Amino acid sequence: GGGGQSFLAADNAVLVSTQCYKRHSYVEIPSNLLVQNGMSLKDGANLYVYKRVNGAFVTLPNTLNTQGRSYETFEPRSDVERDFLDMSEEDFVEKYGKDLGLQHILYGEVDKPQLGGLHTVIGMYRLLRANKLNAKSVTNSDSDVMQNYFVLADNGSYKQVCTVVDLLLDDFLELLRNILNEYGTNKSKVVTVSIDYHSINFMTWFEDGSIKTCYPQLQSAWTCGYNMPELYKVQNCVMEPCNIPNYGVGITLPSGIMMNVAKYTQLCQYLSKTTVCVPHNMRVMHFGAGSDKGVAPGSTVLKQWLPEGTLLVDTDIVDYVSDAHVSVLSDCNKYKTEHKFDLVISDMYTDNDSKRKHGGVIANNGNDDVFIYLSSFLRNNLALGGSFAVKLTETSWHESLYDIAQDCAWWTMFCTAVNASSSEAFLIGVNYLGASVKVKVSGKTLHANYIFWRNCNYLQTSAYSIFDVAKFDLRLKATPVVNLKTEQKTDLVFNLIKCGKLLVRDVGNTSFTSDSFVCTM
């Protein structure tokens, strides 16, 4: 019509039309993607977009289109999708590609303590239909390319956030085939894919010429943080300088909220999702509690998070005031106790250059001084079944801490979202099983793997999760606590410890000398 005429006469213009002019270059927007006043149009015509620059038609880029379906009201739109919902997993994988990692990516590994894979809406729908899944949407914007869900599988295997995409399954399989053909000889590759004209990065890992996993590198902006994917634990990286893509990018916190309050809030939010033991009269030790403000913000957050009746002991080398039950002002090396703890948190920071940093005055004597003490404290004073979170950075770390982490039922490196633009992470060990002689990956290699993860991933900084405090409190799990002799520590006992169902340590009253008073609980 008239719009078409004036478009053809203009040098620079964009035409959006329901007419398809085959002789000109265009992009097609399927009608099912169209939204009017927040309502998606159930039946409408496809739209065609044409663009002219300097009097000539421009070839517009190709993109994959999301389908805009939610997993609750999912309807298949192709034979491939119907096959996926009707066929057995074995038959579907056999028919459409054994080497595409479909078991992980489409079907999801539901039998692990942390749900693996499951990166498509149709995959979620399949599990939902079989009553194998509960999910709660956490982003409700229809303009997001990715949808984010809290996912809970019926056997308790869970994932904090599942980031899924709703592409037509035909398009998704073709995308996987193209990735495999182009990059299959690599070990890993970040592949940028245009979806709804947004550039989405897919992290892809290959093994023996097949895709092992392929997931969108997009965790929602309100996540409490990022934990290192399992695959980075088994790499064999060489130590390189930390070169974080968004290093030093600031974050605006609400007025009156200290960085450490936000950071500890996110650390606690993450620990709440693990199998950390929470007994009655829990005992928590917090190292490096002080701050340059003379207060202990981390202890305040911990006290708010921990159940009623928990004993919180904190310590720092610099003077500070604290909400903890017991505060010890001293060099950590001087702090000794016979008692064992259920959770140990450390925010101590040092590095091998600490003398120079402190103008010749030794606030602490470097990594060996601080972290060898901390390692020996964990070995001697962490209850079996207990957990720990120790702050490390590129230069403030020690290989012995990675050894202890590998003696836990599970471990990871966790970066809080508020501080994701620094090299800081908490080394988290969940459910300590005691010193073992099992073969471990060297701490140097693991630290290099951590740096490698940080160097090749952009972690979005965000403070959103600190507003999500309705369910902040750590749930009292009433984990049983027993004091066992060595010969009583059977396989059954270790299985209970491994699952976070038992703590082994001294029981009864504790006595601590605080800098202000003697405290017996």
Swiss-Prot record:
The keyword Transferase applies. GO terms for molecular function: endonuclease activity; mRNA (nucleoside-2'-O-)-methyltransferase activity; RNA nuclease activity. The record marks 219-220 as: Cleavage. Residues 1-58 form the AV-Nsp11N/CoV-Nsp15M domain. InterPro entries: AV_NSP11N_COV_NSP15M, EndoU-like, NendoU_nidovirus, NIV_2_O_MTASE, NSP15_middle_sf, NSP15_NendoU_CoV, NSP16_CoV-like, SAM-dependent_MTases_sf. It holds the Pfam family CoV_Methyltr_2. Keywords: Endonuclease, Hydrolase, Methyltransferase, Nuclease, Transferase. Residues 219-518 form the Nidovirus-type SAM-dependent 2'-O-MTase domain. One of its GO terms (biological process) is viral translational frameshifting. The active site is at residues 104, 119, 159, 263, 347, 391, 424. Its EC number is 3.1.-.-, 2.1.1.-. Residues 75-216 form the NendoU domain. The replicase polyprotein of coronaviruses is a multifunctional protein: it contains the activities necessary for the transcription of negative stranded RNA, leader RNA, subgenomic mRNAs and progeny virion RNA as well as proteinases responsible for the cleavage of the polyprotein into functional products. This is Replicase polyprotein 1ab.
